[in-house]
């Protein structure tokens, strides 16, 4: 019994603190502005398989953000509020996004592209 306890203590002590080898840096944050009929930037490059936080600022009114090909990710972007969403592109490719809240004539041109590499 004592031998088992000693062996367990040696194993856990040599392993170090839980997660010490797996410390990861905070996710990348991409800042995006949304205003009538455009996102800036409207082309965003990210790494496939790595979570990225998109942080939106609405400059004029409520806008939407949706990426149909990434499981229908969706966010309402409100002026004066923190608007964040984590994006994970599982594989390399091009993913289109658009505003899904009508914001006037020209709304259909409020689009962009996520390029996962």
Regions found by a protein language model. Give the residues of each.
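Bacterial N-terminal signal peptides
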Residues: 2-13
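Extracellular/periplasmic metallocenter environments
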Residues: 15-21, 78-117
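Short structured motifs
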Residues: 38-40, 69-72, 82-84
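Edge beta-strand plus adjacent loop/short-helix module at the start
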Residues: 21-41
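Short loop/turn segments at connectors of secondary-structure elements within structured domains
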Residues: 26, 40, 61-63, 108-110
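Short edge-strand/loop segments of extracellular domains
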Residues: 72-73, 116
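Beta-strand cores of secreted/periplasmic/IMS beta-sandwich domains, seen most often
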Residues: 28-31, 42-61, 80-91, 95, ...
